[in-house]
Amino acid sequence: MIFTQLLNKMQTIKYNYLLYMKKIAFLFLTIRDVNFTKIWDKYFSGNEDKYSIYIHPKFPNEAKWRTDKIISNIKETAWGFITRAYLELFKEAIKDKDNFKFITISESCIPIQSFDNLYKTLASDNRSWIKLMKITKYKHDVILKKNTGNFIHHYARMCLNRHHVKQLLINRDKLEFFHNMQIGDEYFLSVLYPLSNYKDIEITYDDWEYVNEQVKELKNQIKLLYEEQEHNTNTNNKEKINILQDKIKDIAKNPKSITKVIDDLQKIKNSKAFFYRKFTINSDIEDYWEDIINKKLKIKL
């Protein structure tokens, strides 16, 4: 009995020693500020020795939140073109030798598990967390077909370990192709091929299921318009079809945006991810966040 207690105490001391001085680097890519500064401040409160913050705002002069954390080298960004900004964030964060994990965060993200849960989980796992995706025939034919090499399709939000960040920076010359490629942020980890020492898991949840259902419904409408046109030569649905096709292109760019949280609350609570997006600037998430975090505290990791 005494031996068991002593062993447990030694393991606790060893665990605390391993955590000593290790920090998680949060790499914020924003337009101005994160959408919910109060939530992030509460999330970080009391853990100041366990995290580092690096911010790359598109418009740094309009940012007000933690302006001392804004990196000096700001790159031009646009939808689908953010890898240069990512690279600058990684370059800045790797300078701190105490940073052992590097998480990319967008302005519309919020944490849905406590900082303590995240820290303990990452400190006990030396792998990167990268959610992989299948390369569809469309994306292969349109984006990759004319380019040789091995490609990895992955979520744009990830958690990299220090080794993988170093490898990215060593191979920065190979990133030029992805800098000039739309949605290069979903492929730039291809420079790490063959990928090893990673866990295929999403650290941030994006609701693409909702978007996919919307796209499916719009495609069905287009199909019906084509069928109507075929059966009635006097009918011309070209304009209607073009409108729906443009709508699909617009919708398919981003995951579901959440303003009224109540419809998604249970899904958020059930998610095993540590972060969730996209919450619009007008979202009422602040009314629910404490409840979400408290529920997550009961989860045994």
What are these regions (language model features)?
Residues 20-301:
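ER/Golgi luminal nucleotide-sugar-dependent glycosyltransferases, focusing on the catalytic module
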Residues 3, 15-20:
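Aromatic (phenylalanine/tyrosine) cluster motif
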Residues 6-9, 17, 244:
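Generic short amphipathic/hydrophobic targeting helices enriched at N-termini
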Residues 2-12, 235:
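Compositionally biased low-complexity segments enriched in polar/charged residues
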